[in-house]
From Swiss-Prot:
Binding site for GTP: 32-39, 59-63, 81-84, 148-151, 185-188
Keyword annotations of the record: Cell cycle, Cell division, GTP-binding, Magnesium, Metal-binding, Nucleotide-binding, Septation
Identification of the protein by name: Probable GTP-binding protein EngB
Lineage, opening ranks: Bacteria, Pseudomonadati, Pseudomonadota, Betaproteobacteria, Burkholderiales
Family per record: Belongs to the TRAFAC class TrmE-Era-EngA-EngB-Septin-like GTPase superfamily. EngB GTPase family.
Top-level lineage group: Bacteria
Length: 217
């Protein structure tokens, strides 16, 4: 099966807000804790082995990486890989820099259509995950959570993790958050949830495709 995301390539790296590219195409950002499997998920969704660099040193990536999607000369959209968060050994100044960069990007980027938030299915909705959601709340844009590494859980543990995450996300809806909040199980290793994630992401990038698939809950 062919997906738009399979036509992805590196575009640019950004380390300061003023360096964000002056593009008009829609963007989807990918966020998550260090070691939540974010780079691996991006690579499997784009059907490439090393599009997003998976560092063996958690917290090493402290900048924003852009990938163009579609035709190289006239991209349809951009995928935006945000720095992993939550690694204790990152120096305080670097951590403060990228937290400021993340929050400013999430709240001010008009091209942004939604966030794909990666959470380790064994430890969903940590305090830092909640902070990321709360940075995004003012935008009213959708957040879709991928509960990664679900292959490491039993079937019942996976069901429980998904239910607990959905319950936690429902708290934001009850508090008045206007954007869609959805979640699904995901495993790059066992290829669980890949087609489901593809369909949702492409419905954000190409609105007319939205009616062709049901949105995960």
């Amino acid at each position: 099966m062919s997906f738009l995301l399979h036509q992805s390539r590196f575009f640019t790296t950004v380390n300061h807000l003023q360096d964000l590219p002056a593009t008009s195409q829609p963007e989807i950002c990918f966020a998550g804790r260090s070691n939540a499997g974010k780079s691996t998920a991006i690579n499997i969704l784009c059907n490439q082995k090393r599009l997003a660099f998976a560092s063996k040193t958690p917290g090493r990536t402290q900048h924003i990486n852009y990938f163009s999607v579609g035709n190289a000369d006239e991209p349809t959209a951009h995928l935006v890989d945000l720095p992993g968060y939550g690694y204790a050994e990152v120096p305080g100044a670097a951590k403060a820099h990228w937290e400021a960069l993340l929050s400013a990007y999430l709240q001010s980027r008009s091209q942004l259509r939604g966030m794909i938030l990666m959470m380790d299915s064994r430890r969903p909705l940590t305090d830092l995950d909640r902070r990321m959601i709360e940075w995004f709340v003012p935008t009213g844009k959708p957040i879709h959570t991928l509960l990664t590494k679900c292959d490491k859980l039993t079937r019942q543990e996976s069901v429980n993790a998904l239910r607990a995450t959905q319950k936690g996300l429902a708290e934001y809806r009850a508090a008045g958050y206007r954007g869609e909040l959805t979640a699904q199980l995901f495993s790059a290793l066992k290829r669980i949830g890949i087609d489901e994630a593809h369909a949702l992401i492409e419905s954000w990038l190409i609105p007319e495709a939205k009616g062709e698939t049901d949105t995960p809950q």
